[in-house]
Every structure is written in structure tokens, then in C-alpha cells.
UniProtKB/Swiss-Prot annotation:
InterPro entries: MFS (IPR011701), MFS_dom (IPR020846), MFS_trans_sf (IPR036259), Multi-R_MdtD (IPR023721)
Cytoplasmic side: 33-48, 98-101, 159-164, 218-221, 284-285, 363-395, 452-470
Gene Ontology cellular-component terms listed: plasma membrane
Topology class, membrane: Multi-pass membrane protein
GO molecular function: transmembrane transporter activity
Gene field: mdtD
Transmembrane segments: 12-32, 49-69, 77-97, 102-124, 138-158, 165-185, 197-217, 222-242, 263-283, 286-306, 342-362, 396-416, 431-451
Protein name (Swiss-Prot/TrEMBL): Putative multidrug resistance protein MdtD
CDD domains, A to Z: MFS_LmrB_MDR_like
Subcellular location: Cell inner membrane
Matches recorded under HAMAP family: MFS_MdtD
Keyword Magnesium attached: no
Keywords: Cell inner membrane, Cell membrane, Membrane, Transmembrane, Transmembrane helix, Transport
Gene3D superfamilies, per the entry: MFS general substrate transporter like domains, Multidrug resistance protein D
Length: 470
């Protein structure tokens, strides 16, 4: 890093700033949801749409981000990403209704979807290959600090200012980032193949409509017949994409990816697994505030052990997988996460609050080990010609499954609760208890998929893949 020119180091700082903004936003909002609900005159049971709208937009836009950067230029797209994210943040802060907030989060999600992948692409273009790993470590470090800082910062802002400030703090940072990008970032472009617009639209429509159909009756009052039509339309769009990809060699995601057994198993397991685990960061601060009566700041602080556990486990997960193999690790961590989630609810309802940080630390560790193992299993056997496409599809599936997970969590709360539930009451405890039991079952189910991972998917495979990528 010290050997790089000054202008390149400044460019890396710009990318790091984008990573920080995007990662901070993924965790800072969850702590503020109960306060948002009160301010907007909404039931807390409907506030999951604030999270779903952002994550689903990121999932939809991810496949187009790399192509746009290559075609239009990394500086232009990164600049546009920061501007859209900043404008979305401003409109979020100005929102007076839930619908306005959801629309503003969609705009914010368009910017967020392009920020991280285009940032990675920028680093590839401006840094010599020999220093690429050091540069990526530098720019992703703020992205690791964001989730750690987000819950506590969100709690402080909500408790001592208002929820609007979790969005307003993005504005000065975004203005500085956009100006620096425009003045300092080179605008690399390359010759690109034709973008698969029909395939992109089919996938986007399918994902959006299916997610809407999953929760439309609760959050939007859509009739059952309309929901059935939406579900059928979404499924038809996905099937049409499969037919399109089968006949089109330039499809957005080639079906040749699924000829690799570990990719198919890993992708299916990642989709199912992240539906369950995606519920936890959303549900935990909501339960701590509404179910237990914690203040926003206290609830935010309680999320820090989970992030610390996740960061700490990343340092040893390779050794664990190499020692026990993918199948054992994935089955054990999947079932373990379900048990830890039940332990969290039991400890909370028993009033043993002093144990909650320890349980959340354990939850973060188990979840991180499972995430890392799922990601590596999915990509490790892909041929080099398909590695980039497979990674893009995995990233899209990760975001989609998390949006579905939050949607299902909101649906479960609505199913067991009423439109307005009291804070720290016996009835509210029952609502969250039943919701957590269902969540534990959903979290455990992917173990059936991971049990099919072949026995030879074991030692040294993580290390060898990492060496190949270097």
C-alpha cells in the first residue's frame, strides 16, 4: 500500500467510504424500526417493509451493476451510486408516511446495489495485481466496522435525537464522497458483451412479485385472489427465465453453472439458510425494544456481541472446515443456530438479561461459520470461466433470501399478534415466543439440504480455492 501513488491511495479511500456507507445502513435501521413505527403512526408489525424494500432492490439491481460499470465507466457509476444513495437517505428522512419511506428506501437500494460491486471492480482496475489483496483488505475494513457501529449508533441517534438522523448522517458523507469520486476517480471502461435485458427483467419481475405475494395480504391489504395471481405471475417469470437461459448463450446467468453439483447444493442451501438467519438481525432489536422494553440505545448495544462473534469466527472457520469437512460443519452450525435462537428467547423470557450478550456472541459465531462455509462450498468447484457469474448469482441469492426472511418474520408477527401490541406485556411475550419457535424450525430445515453434501467435500478445499484465487 505504501508503494502506491498518492492519487491511487485517495481512490481507495473513496471506495472504502462507499463500503462503509453501505454496510452501516444494513444495521443502523433495524434498531430504529419501533421508533419509526411510533412516529409514522404505524404498527411495528408493518415496519419490516422498510428493510425488505432496500434488500430486495439490492438483489434486483446487483446483476446489472458490473455491466453498467464496464459500459459507462467505474467513475460515472460509482458517482451515480453515491448520489442515489444520498438522495434516497434525504427522502427517507423527509418521509411522513410508511409508503413514502419504502419508496425512498428503494431509491437508496439502487445506489447501495452498485456501490460495493463497482467498488471492488474499481480496485481491480487501479491497483497492480500483486497488491490487490492488501488493497481489498484496506477498503473492506470500514465495511466490517459499519455493522459493529451501526446498532449502537442507531440507538444513540434514536434515543437522543430522532430516527430521521440515521439517514441524515449519510448526507454530508455522501456529498464528500460524490465530489471526491468526480474529481479523483478515473473512468475506466471496457468493451462489453450485450446486456441480457430480457433475462434481467424476467428475474427482477419474478423476485419482486413473489416477495410481494408472500406478504401482500398483511402489509398492503391485497385480496387472496390477487395474491394468487401475483404468485403465479412471479413463478411464471422465473420459469420463462430458465427457458430463456437454456436457449441463450449470453444469458445473465448460464444454466451451465448448475452442472457443478456443489454449486447447486450450495446455492440451494444458501437460499434456504439465509431465509432463516436473515430474520435474526431484524427480529432481535425489535424484540428487545417491544418485547422486553429496552431503550433503543440499550438494544443497539446488545447487538454488538453478535457482530463481534461473527468477526472473530472468520479467523478460524477455515481450520474448522478443513478439520471436520463441509457436511459436518454445515449441518452442525445449521442445527446449532436454531438451538441458539431458542436459547436466546428462553434466556430473555426468564429474565436472565445478563446472559443475553453471551448468547448473542455465540449466535454470531455460529452464524458466521455457517455463512463462510456456505459461500465457499458454493463457489469452490466452479471452473474459472464461470466463477464470476457464479459469484454474482450467489450475491443476488443472498440478498433475495434475506428479504424473504424478513418478510416471513413480519408475516409471522402479524399472524400471532394484533395490529397494535403492547410493550413488555405477557401477550407480547407470547407473540414473540411463537414467532421464535417458527423461526427456529425455518432455520433448522436447511440441514436436510446440507446432509446431502458429498463426503469428499472436505479437507484442504478451502485453502486450495483461496490459493487459486490469489
Amino acid at each position: 500500500m505504501t508503494e502506491l501513488p498518492d492519487n491511487t491511495r485517495w481512490q481507495l479511500w473513496i471506495v472504502a467510504l462507499g463500503f462503509f456507507m453501505q454496510s452501516l445502513d444494513t444495521t443502523i435501521v433495524n434498531t430504529a424500526l419501533p421508533s419509526m413505527a411510533k412516529s409514522l403512526g404505524e404498527s411495528p408489525l408493518h415496519m419490516h417493509m422498510v428493510v425488505v424494500s432496500y434488500v430486495l432492490t439490492v438483489a434486483v439491481m446487483l446483476p446489472a451493476s458490473g455491466w453498467l460499470a464496464d459500459k459507462i465507466g467505474v467513475r460515472n457509476i460509482f458517482f451515480a451510486a453515491i448520489v442515489l444513495f444520498t438522495l434516497g437517505s434525504l427522502f427517507c428522512a423527509l418521509s411522513g408516511t410508511l409508503n413514502q419511506l419504502v419508496l425512498a428506501r428503494v431509491l437508496q437500494g439502487v445506489g447501495g446495489a452498485m456501490m460495493v460491486p463497482v467498488g471492488r471492480l474499481t480496485v481491480m482496475k487501479i491497483v497492480p495485481r500483486a497488491q490487490y489483496m492488501a488493497a481489498m483488505t484496506f477498503v473492506t475494513l470500514p465495511g466490517q466496522i459499519g455493522p459493529l457501529l451501526g446498532p449502537a449508533l442507531g440507538g444513540v441517534l434514536v434515543e437522543y435525537a430522532s430516527w430521521h438522523w440515521i439517514f441524515l448522517i449519510n448526507i454530508p458523507v455522501g456529498i464528500v464522497g460524490a465530489m471526491a469520486t468526480f474529481m479523483l476517480m478515473p473512468n475506466y471502461t471496457i468493451e462489453t458483451r450485450r446486456f441480457d435485458l430480457p433475462g434481467f427483467l424476467l428475474l427482477a419481475i419474478g423476485m419482486a412479485v413473489l416477495t410481494l405475494a408472500l406478504d401482500g395480504s398483511k402489509s398492503m391489504g391485497i385480496s387472496p385472489w390477487t395474491l394468487a395471481g401475483l404468485a403465479a405471475g412471479g413463478a411464471a417469470a422465473i420459469l420463462l427465465y430458465l427457458l430463456h437461459a437454456k436457449k441463450n448463450s449470453g444469458a445473465l446467468f448460464s444454466l451451465r453453472l448448475f452442472r457443478t453439483p456443489t454449486f447447486s447444493l450450495g446455492l440451494l442451501g444458501s437460499f434456504a439458510g439465509r431465509i432463516g438467519s436473515g430474520m435474526l438481525p431484524f427480529m432481535t432489536p425489535v424484540f428487545l425494544q417491544i418485547g422486553l422494553g429496552f431503550s433503543p440505545f440499550h438494544a443497539g448495544l446488545m447487538m454488538i456481541p453478535m457482530v463481534l462473534g461473527s468477526m472473530g469466527m472468520k479467523r478460524i472457520v477455515v481450520q474448522i472446515v478443513n478439520r471436520f469437512g463441509y457436511r459436518r460443519v454445515l449441518v452442525a452450525t445449521t442445527l446449532g443456530l436454531a438451538l441458539v435462537s431458542l436459547l436466546f428467547m428462553s434466556v430473555a423470557l426468564l429474565g436472565w438479561y445478563y446472559l443475553l450478550p453471551l448468547v448473542l456472541l455465540l449466535q454470531g459465531m455460529v452464524n458466521s461459520a455457517r455463512f463462510s462455509s456456505m459461500n465457499t462450498l458454493t463457489l469452490k468447484d466452479l471452473p474459472d470461466t464461470l466463477a464470476s457469474s457464479g459469484n454474482s448469482l450467489l450475491s443476488m441469492i443472498m440478498q433475495l433470501s434475506m428479504s424473504i426472511g424478513v418478510t416471513i418474520a413480519g408475516m409471522l408477527l402479524g399472524m400471532f399478534g394484533q395490529q397494535h401490541i403492547g410493550i413488555d406485556s405477557s401477550a407480547t411475550h407470547h407473540v414473540f415466543m411463537y414467532t421464535w419457535l417458527c423461526m427456529a424450525v425455518i432455520i433448522a430445515l436447511p440441514a436436510i439440504i446440507f446432509a446431502r453434501v458429498p463426503n469428499d467435500t472436505q479437507q484442504n478445499m478451502v485453502i486450495s480455492r483461496r490459493k487459486r484465487s490469489l
